[in-house]
Amino acid sequence: KVNYSQTRTNPQYPQWQGDDITTNPGSNKQVAAEIDRFAPVNSNKGVKDCWSDHYAIIKAANFIIQNASKTPTDAASLNQAIDQAKFWRAYAYFTLVRLFGDIPLTLTNENDDFTMKPSSVEQVYEQIVADLTSDECEGLPASYKNAPAFLNGVNVYVTKQAVEATRAAVYMAMAGWPLGKGTAYYKKAADEAKKVIEG
């Protein structure tokens, strides 16, 4: 729900550049078609939106992580907020690094003037893994019972399985190009996927 409300179809962009999905050449999806052909123009609104929408998620996540302790509430609620924020920050960076390569990596909102130098792909992936393997993300439940985490029979908040599935995707990406970490990371991906399958 957070993903769709904040990024709409933007997370599909890395898939359009691969073999998972393609666009209909007869459709009016020019924005997607340019990305599908690896030929987006400078004015491509989808690319601009993808960048700004995902950095908006990162900025919100950083704000929560930095300021949750100042909120007058119980420890369980604070930890839950940080859990969710770390996952969404990792998820946003994972989408961005696959699309753009080297990107600015910010873990605070102190430098908001857009002058940060890009971090390397490897540095970005290291932070993604750090967030997804943090104590907070490791402690997420398999399901929720009460609103707002659980609405209309659906887990709305991030679950343990969502983290494991995302880690599997991250390790798969790290195993191949451009990092080329190889067999060990394919095994990590398989191990995480097995956790999801086995519940």
Q: What is the predicted function of each stretch?
A:
Residues Y4-R37, I65, R98-P104, Y125-A149, ...:
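Aromatic-residue-lined binding/catalytic grooves and analogous aromatic/hydrophobic interfacial grooves
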Residues K70-A76, L105-T106, G180-T183:
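Short coil/turn and helix-start
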Residues P25-F100, F114-E126, L132-F150:
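Conserved, well-structured interaction surfaces
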Residues K1:
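Mature N-terminal segment immediately following signal peptide/propeptide cleavage
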